[in-house]
């Protein structure tokens, strides 16, 4: 009997990304956001290589199975490009990445633009809608914000978090 393969968490700045990992990350983003969601848009937005950007992903046997990007937007951290490979969905990787991202962010406010059907997922991690639904590349999104831990808005959420 062989042990179950383990997903390895990796983190890097753009400068620290090797070309193989960068290619696998960009391929996953294109496979899901462009091909699967049928959304032709410019994924390469010039933010991946900013000095404050952090890349987090799970890999198994050389395959990037889930990914998230954290941008430093001055007074807030911006979470984006949250993506899970079709073959890895249901394994809880997106939730584990969110927990890791929030650990890295620490006691700073964070924002994201959630695809509308994922609002409840992000709410599990303390995010709350901050504006009306809008279309981005034809997909409904809702702006969300998470206040630093310990504030009145988030202090009761830690106990309610559950894995994805």
Enumerate the predicted regions with their spans.
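Conserved beta-strand in the GNAT
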Residues: 57, 63-71, 76-83
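Short amphipathic alpha-helix that is part of the acyltransferase structural core
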Residues: 2-48, 55-63, 158-164
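Short, charged/polar, Gly/Pro-enriched secondary-structure boundary elements
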Residues: 149-154
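Short acidic/glycine-enriched loop/turn segments that link adjacent beta-strands
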Residues: 50, 75, 136-140
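Conserved active-site alpha-helix within GNAT-family acetyltransferase domains
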Residues: 113-140
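Conserved acetyl-CoA-binding loop-helix of GNAT-fold acetyltransferases
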Residues: 84, 89-103
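Conserved GNAT acetyl-CoA-binding A-motif
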Residues: 103-116
């Amino acid at each position: 009997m062989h042990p179950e393969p383990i997903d390895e968490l990796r983190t890097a700045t753009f400068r620290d990304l090797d070309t193989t990992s960068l290619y696998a990350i960009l391929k996953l983003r294109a496979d899901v956001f462009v091909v699967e969601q049928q959304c032709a848009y410019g994924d390469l937005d010039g933010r991946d290589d900013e000095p404050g950007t952090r890349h987090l992903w799970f890999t198994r046997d050389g395959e990037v199975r889930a990914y998230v990007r954290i941008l430093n937007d001055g007074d807030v951290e911006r979470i984006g490009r949250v993506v899970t490979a079709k073959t890895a969905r249901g394994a809880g990787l997106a939730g584990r990445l969110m927990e890791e991202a929030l650990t890295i962010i620490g006691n700073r406010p964070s924002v994201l633009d959630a695809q509308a059907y994922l609002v409840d997922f992000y709410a599990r991690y303390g995010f709350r809608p901050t504006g009306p639904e809008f279309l981005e590349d034809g997909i409904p999104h809702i702006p969300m914000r998470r206040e630093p831990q310990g504030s009145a808005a988030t202090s009761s959420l830690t106990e309610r978090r559950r894995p994805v």
